[in-house]
Amino acid sequence: MCIRDRKAVFDIADGNIKKDTAEIAPIIDEAIKGIQAAAEKPDGISGLPSGFNALDAVTSGWQPSDLVIIAARPAMGKTAFVLSMARNMAVKHHQAVAIFSLEMSAVQLVNRLIASETELSAEKLKTGRLTDEEWQQLHSRIKALVEAPILVDDTPALSIFELRAKCRRLKQKYGIKVLIIDYLQLMTAGADMRGNREQEVSLISRQLKIIAKELSIPVMALSQLNRGVESRPDKKPMLSDLRESGSIEQDADMVMFIHRPEKYGITVDNEGNSLLGIATIIIAKHRSGAVGEVNLRFRAELTCLLYTSDAADDRI
């Protein structure tokens, strides 16, 4: 192990040791306060709302210290989904969101947010061919994003140790309330781990959970699925489809899949209902709550962002 990576490991270990053992009484007091705070909220959402009502009803919002894995095959809308939630948390609820984009540049990522916020298609924004009215719409609606507490880091090939150091600084300086990583398999665990990808991914997922606990914020990490999902008739993902490491499932407090049947030519369900424009969020693991499925509306023309299917005013 190189000196830099060894020092990072020692620093992490030292940080964990410094946390004192506590007696149960003050912990109970803290737990009771949390229960009382949840009881006082009329919507029953104890965590940070995603903005999707049906999803929040199942999850009760994103909880501090939770590691949430959002997985899907390519082009299913993983980035669109988390960007939709990031926009809602930052613009609507004024919570600081940190996004680490290892796949797209910061400008590409923000262009997606602009498309969603302005309701101007990605194609129009790409070509710049806007009418005078659309230019006015762009400048008028973009103000909400300009003022939003969204932080973007597009450092490529980021190591888990660099991520942890950056997140500590962001928590101290901006008070970030949620961390988003796009996506897990593009991270590294240092030079010593290269060549053993399964062990590397295991270390990364374990450290992401540690970051969530250390900073007391939800950490949402996108993940790829293997091709096994495409061998099934219904094409629905399962926990066994998580790519490269079973430790991802083990470390996660929640595992969610994004499933778009129409991508596989499945346009109606067993009851004859249309599946066009539908994205199903499958909650396959939920350590502290229920599992199940939630249907959301998919808007491909707005850079594949997800909208709720059951409430017109829930635009994210």
PLM regions and their residue ranges:
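C-terminal regions of RecA-like/P-loop NTPase motor modules
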Residues: 127, 133, 159-176, 193-195, ...
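Conserved small/polar residues in nucleotide/adenosyl-binding loops
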Residues: 1-5, 307-316
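The Walker A (P-loop) glycine that initiates the GxxxxGKT/S ATP-binding motif of P-loop NTPases
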Residues: 72
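Conserved lysine of the Walker
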Residues: 78
